[in-house]
Amino acid sequence: MYLLVFKLFLFLSLLQISVSARNLASQEPNQFQLLKYHKGALLSGKISVNLIWYGKFKPSQRAIISDFITSLTHTSPTSKTLHQPSVATWWKTTEKYYKLATPSKNSSPLSLTLGKQIIDESCSLGKSLTDKKIQTLASKGDQRNAINVVLTSADVTVTGFGMSRCGTHGHARGLGKRGSKFAYIWVGNSETQCPGQCAWPFHAPVYGPQSPPLVAPNNDVGLDGMVINLASLLAGTATNPFGNGYYQGPQNAPLEAASACPGVYGKGAYPGYAGDLLVDTTTGGSFNAYGANGRKFLLPALYDPTTSACSTMV
């Protein structure tokens, strides 16, 4: 399992805060952040993202996540009608990892599409989940050419949620002796349990500099926070699906494409300040990427391996 480390927990002291913020905000190359390629397989080709809804979610909440997944490869018939910066443009940063890993090969680029949606409102495995139960839920989705995403509702507890992680990504082997490995993700709705850890900057942080929380672009602190964490974990899954791709640090708690840029969403970011963002003039919601169906999302900066810097959309 690979942890999505709390953004503010990564700043272990005021000294570390100031050094990290200066390098990230100025976009200067920082060798400490360089993600090493460990020669393992990366996801490629057409991959379905299957959503496994565990607990009660409103249809409007499910639409936020499904629209985000659709937005990853969403293109408009004409470039003039495609709002920029877009979610699809944000995702293209991950392609740079593939080109560096296989410079002489013509491997199929990764293309993510929204797959099946499985709804388990009755919480068939109970409302207190362990990692093993998360893996069991993830196995309900397709196990070939798929990423299975388990999304837990606000009243479901998961080991470590709100204490050491906001979500995880990992891999498991499918059923049968010759079952192939498949990738999975878990993200929880932190709205009532730990919004200060997992829904910043839409909620005041538990630790660190305090500033007024931003307005969530889809008017749902929990779900907009889930989008941030899901986006980070999807980037990590694409570039380090089986624990031997691009990462830095310990294999079971690595820095990856998004977690290498903690707390950065726009230019000028520093601890307690997400960066200079776009603001919806009607709702007041802060965002940095346009998505499908008129959506607006706030997405984390991604580490750009070609520049050794954190790349932001705005």
From Swiss-Prot:
GO cellular component annotations of the record: apoplast; Golgi apparatus; plant-type cell wall
Localization (cell): Secreted; Secreted, Extracellular space; Secreted, Extracellular space, Apoplast
Tissue-specificity statement: Expressed in root tips, vascular tissue of roots, shoot apex, rosette leaves and embryos.
Signal peptide coordinates: 1-21
GO biological process: response to brassinosteroid
Induction context: By the synthetic auxin naphthaleneacetic acid (NAA) and 24-epibrassinolide. Down-regulated by kinetin.
Keywords of this entry: Apoplast, Secreted, Signal
UniProt keyword annotation of Secreted present: yes
Phenotype caused by lack of the gene: Reduced leaf size, root length and biomass production due to diminished expansion of epidermis and parenchyma cells.
Primary location class: secreted
Protein purpose: Required for cell expansion in leaves. May mediate brassinosteroid (BR)-induced leaf growth. May play a role in the control of BR responses in roots. May be involved in signaling processes that coordinate BR responses with environmental or developmental signals.
Misc remark: Over-expression of EXO promotes growth in both shoots and roots.
The family this protein is said to belong to: Belongs to the EXORDIUM family.
Protein name: Protein EXORDIUM
Gene name, Swiss-Prot/TrEMBL: EXO
